């Protein structure tokens, strides 16, 4: 094993982290469900490429369930998945993403799961770093997640969710190409990653975004 004796603790940390990361982005209607749909479809494509039929079937079922649920969860939501639903999605994605699908290159083995789950991972990391820097508990709920930043910049819920879908899709596509291409071609993915990174940086660092004073409470999103 690449990690040796660190494999077991690293696996536990990964599963707990991803499970909670997906739960933490469930602050706007349809966000966690849509991002999980994109991630599961990314895993489905990769599983088909590497001929992992069982994983492909599981991810097809998960993506189908999310797609069926999504119309009722979009703003204005008629049904909410709650913490139980979002943590379930995070757990399944975390477990399947470390099942050994990515054996082409050592760097790819590490990079692909981080890419396809990049949005919840980076949002959670920034949230924890920000809270610690402000002397708060990392588990303290606030309104400074990436989706809250978009709302504060003047986007409505549907627009904010659409922007995050695009970022998640770019990262998912990058994960697929990285799995199916050699190292030289994989370097070209830096263009897509830089594009996604520029958008993310603008969101996270745009501290003085426009606020909608007349916005309804349900447009503000849930604190996580």
Specify the residue positions occupied by each region the protein language model found.
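Transmembrane alpha-helices and membrane-interface helical segments
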Residues: 16-20, 96-99
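Asparagine-centered polar/low-complexity signal
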Residues: 20-23, 73-75
């Amino acid at each position: 094993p690449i990690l040796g004796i660190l494999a077991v603790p690293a696996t536990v940390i990964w599963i707990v982290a991803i499970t909670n990361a997906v739960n933490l982005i469930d602050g706007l209607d349809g966000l966690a469900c849509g991002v999980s749909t994109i991630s599961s479809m990314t895993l489905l494509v990769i599983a088909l490429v590497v001929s992992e039929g069982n994983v492909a079937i599981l991810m097809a079922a998960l993506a189908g369930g999310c797609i069926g649920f999504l119309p009722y969860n979009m703003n204005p939501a008629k049904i909410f998945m709650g913490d139980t639903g979002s943590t379930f999605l995070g757990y399944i994605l975390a477990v399947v993403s470390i099942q050994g699908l990515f054996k082409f290159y050592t760097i790819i083995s590490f990079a692909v799961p981080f890419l396809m789950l990049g949005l919840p991972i980076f949002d959670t990391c920034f949230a924890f770093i920000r809270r610690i820097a402000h002397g708060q508990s990392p588990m303290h709920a606030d309104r400074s997640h990436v989706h809250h930043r978009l709302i504060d910049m003047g986007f409505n819920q549907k627009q904010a969710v659409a922007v995050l879908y695009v970022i998640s899709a770019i990262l998912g596509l990058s994960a697929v190409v990285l799995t199916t291409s050699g190292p030289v071609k994989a370097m070209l993915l830096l263009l897509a990653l830089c594009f996604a990174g520029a958008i993310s940086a603008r969101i996270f660092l745009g501290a003085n975004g426009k606020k909608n004073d007349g916005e309804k409470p349900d447009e503000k999103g849930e604190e996580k």
